[in-house]
């Protein structure tokens, strides 16, 4: 599981598959966001495109190499905007989550920020890359 956190906010993003259709571009995922160790979002059925993972991974790797100052990603399920900015060797991850309130026919959004150093970001992207590779050959359930 790929986790990154600072003193207040923790993000976990883990691609997983129990069965795979070869032509299915979606990856069932775990998306969890904690604030002060309390769940803000805990979605065990998040669905992200494989291309979204690849854009995120390659963008972070490019930032770490110093060839890019920022990246952004917008996902559908859950509906969120994720951006990472780099300044003076420090990284700021912004996560904006859109919540739909079907009872009142409106949307609410919350913005969360994680501040980290290069080592934490590199650990996150390494774990995310490994998790994505492991979805290609999922373990068989009994």
Swiss-Prot record:
Disruption phenotype: A double wapA-wapI deletion strain is growth inhibited when cocultured with wild-type cells. When wapI is reintroduced it restores growth in a cognate toxin-dependent fashion. Growth inhibition by wild-type cells is strongest on LB medium and less effective on media that promote biofilm formation (MSgg and 2xSGG). It comes from the Bacteria. Induction: Constitutively and highly expressed on solid and in liquid medium, with or without biofilm formation by 12 hours of culture. Repressed by DegU. It holds the Pfam family WapI. InterPro entries: WapI. Immunity protein component of a toxin-immunity protein module, which functions as a cellular contact-dependent growth inhibition (CDI) system. Neutralizes the tRNase activity of cognate toxin WapA upon expression in E.coli. Does not inhibit WapA from other strains of B.subtilis. The WapA C-terminus cannot be expressed on its own in E.coli, however it can be cloned in the presence of its cognate immunity protein gene. Cell contact is necessary for growth inhibition. Unlike the LXG toxin-immunity modules, WapAI mediates competition under shaking culture conditions. This is Immunity protein WapI. It comes from Bacillus subtilis (strain 168). The gene is wapI.
């Amino acid at each position: 599981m790929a986790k990154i956190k600072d003193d207040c906010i923790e993000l976990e993003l883990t691609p997983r598959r129990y069965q795979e259709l070869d032509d299915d571009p979606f990856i069932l995922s775990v998306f969890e966001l904690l604030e002060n160790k309390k769940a803000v979002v805990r979605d065990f059925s998040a669905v992200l495109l494989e291309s979204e993972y690849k854009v995120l991974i390659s963008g972070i790797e490019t930032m770490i190499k110093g060839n890019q100052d920022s990246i952004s990603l917008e996902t559908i399920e859950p509906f969120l905007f994720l951006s990472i900015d780099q300044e003076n060797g420090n990284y700021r991850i912004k996560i904006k989550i859109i919540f739909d309130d079907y009872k009142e026919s409106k949307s609410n959004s919350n913005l969360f920020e994680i501040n980290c150093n290069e080592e934490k970001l590199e650990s996150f992207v390494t774990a995310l890359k490994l998790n994505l590779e492991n979805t290609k050959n999922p373990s068989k359930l009994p």
